[in-house]
């Protein structure tokens, strides 16, 4: 019996979990490592675009992901200055391009949990919590991963290592890979509330609010109880401390700026975080690969980061499968050529433009950006082209052209 190719995956966020599950389903031996003792359930990404739903279907999680989330056919742009809707975009225009012409709003910790549960069905797959990577070495024959578990260090040997261990990636740092880009001077405040913005103000499940004073994002998620809750994202002022931004008066002022009916008693979570636009100088060093946030970070406007990470995972597993079948080692570089190039052309470019569109302060430029959105909505051909990019379906198509 042929020896199983062993893949170690560092990081049990959704990208690492999808990578591990896809590896197991392709007949690899898999060890999934997570430094923490549990899955992180803090409010993070929740938007799963049509292109990513196709990949989620491939690993057998589409029904559960959809059942645990909210289906969002539309997304809207609003003008905070005039309190009016600017444009609405309809994913149903993609019905001839994908089996999933909609977005599913399912929190990322749910995807990680269901993926780990399914991973347990495969006898050659193992999940290890409280397992932190502390050293990596490699040669032509494999990679050695030193892992700290319960105060002791153990060494795992494998054929390949996937670093999906987040923006502060230990794997990336151990490889000495530069993380090129910048950090925004403002932080983002995320407020989760039970207030029903759809009932009160007519917002749909995904909303982008442009404002000359301050922009906002507003979207609905199901919650673990499936009762529904809303997340509102705001920029902080550069002079504002974390404590000031999360204080009751600031929280209430931000929420009532969207809907005067909001109250503090409906707020169930508040958080603040730094925001980056960064990309790793390399996605591959020998037998070690980076995927997800370990290889790229972007602002969350548009919900593209997690989606791009899942695309990384699926592209990488396909690359490893080709190597197992006899493709030359040089073909492994195709992963970097595809994923790094597409991250720059689709993720970095779109998220930077998304932020500029919402925060524009110059009256003439601001009007031009809003008018462009109106024109896109009015033209089905242009709207579909816009949706092909925002859903990353165009990215998936373009990947196949990069040899």
What are the roles of these predicted feature ranges?
Residues 3, 151-160:
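Core beta-strand elements of the Rossmann-like FAD/NAD(P) dinucleotide-binding domain
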Residues 11-21, 115, 163, 267, ...:
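Conserved mid-domain beta->alpha element of the FAD-binding
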Residues 24-44:
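Glycine-rich FAD pyrophosphate-binding loop
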Residues 44, 49-118, 347:
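Active-site-adjacent segment of FAD-dependent monooxygenases/related oxidoreductases
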Residues 117, 160, 164-275:
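Conserved FAD-binding catalytic core of PHBH/FMO-like flavoproteins
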Residues 318-403:
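C-terminal helical "tail/cap" subdomain of flavin- and related membrane-associated enzymes
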């Amino acid at each position: 019996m042929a020896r199983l190719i062993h893949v170690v995956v560092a990081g049990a966020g959704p990208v690492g979990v999808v990578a591990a599950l896809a590896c197991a389903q392709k007949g690899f031996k898999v060890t999934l490592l997570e430094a923490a003792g549990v899955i992180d359930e803090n409010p993070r990404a929740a938007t799963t675009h049509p292109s990513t739903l196709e990949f989620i279907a491939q690993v057998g999680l589409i029904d559960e992901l959809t059942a645990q989330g909210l289906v969002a056919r539309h997304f809207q742009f609003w003008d905070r200055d005039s309190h009016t809707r600017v444009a609405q975009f309809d994913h149903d225009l993609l019905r001839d391009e994908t089996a999933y012409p909609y977005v599913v709003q399912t929190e990322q910790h749910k995807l990680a949990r269901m993926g780990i549960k399914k991973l347990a069905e495969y006898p050659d797959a193992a999940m290890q919590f409280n397992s932190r990577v502390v050293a990596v070495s490699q040669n032509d024959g494999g990679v050695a991963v030193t892992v700290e578990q319960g105060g002791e260090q153990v060494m795992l040997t494998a054929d390949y290592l996937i670093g999906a261990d987040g923006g502060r990636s230990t794997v990336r740092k151990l490889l000495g890979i530069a993380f090129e880009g910048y950090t925004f001077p403002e932080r983002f405040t995320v407020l989760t509330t039970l207030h029903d913005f759809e009932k009160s103000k007519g917002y749909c499940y995904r909303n982008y609010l442009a404002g000359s004073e301050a922009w906002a994002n507003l979207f609905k998620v199901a919650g673990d109880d499936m009762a529904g809750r809303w997340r509102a994202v705001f920029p902080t002022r550069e002079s504002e401390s974390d404590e000031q931004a999360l204080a009751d008066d600031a929280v209430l002022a931000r929420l009532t700026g969207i809907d005067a009916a909001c109250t503090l008693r409906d707020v169930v979570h508040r958080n603040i975080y730094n925001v980056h636009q960064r990309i790793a100088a390399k996605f591959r060093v020998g037998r070690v690969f980076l995927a997800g946030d370990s290889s790229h970070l972007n602002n969350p406007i548009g919900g593209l980061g997690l989606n791009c990470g899942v695309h990384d995972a699926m592209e990488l597993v396909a690359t490893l499968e080709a190597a197992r079948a006899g493709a030359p080692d040089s073909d492994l570089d195709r992963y970097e050529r595809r994923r790094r190039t597409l991250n720059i052309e689709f993720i970095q470019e779109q998220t930077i433009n998304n932020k500029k569109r919402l925060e524009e302060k110059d009256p003439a430029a601001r009007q031009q950006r809003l008018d462009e959105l109106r024109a896109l909505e009015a033209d089905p051909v242009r709207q579909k082209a816009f949706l092909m990019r925002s859903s990353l379906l165009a990215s998936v198509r373009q990947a196949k052209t990069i040899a």
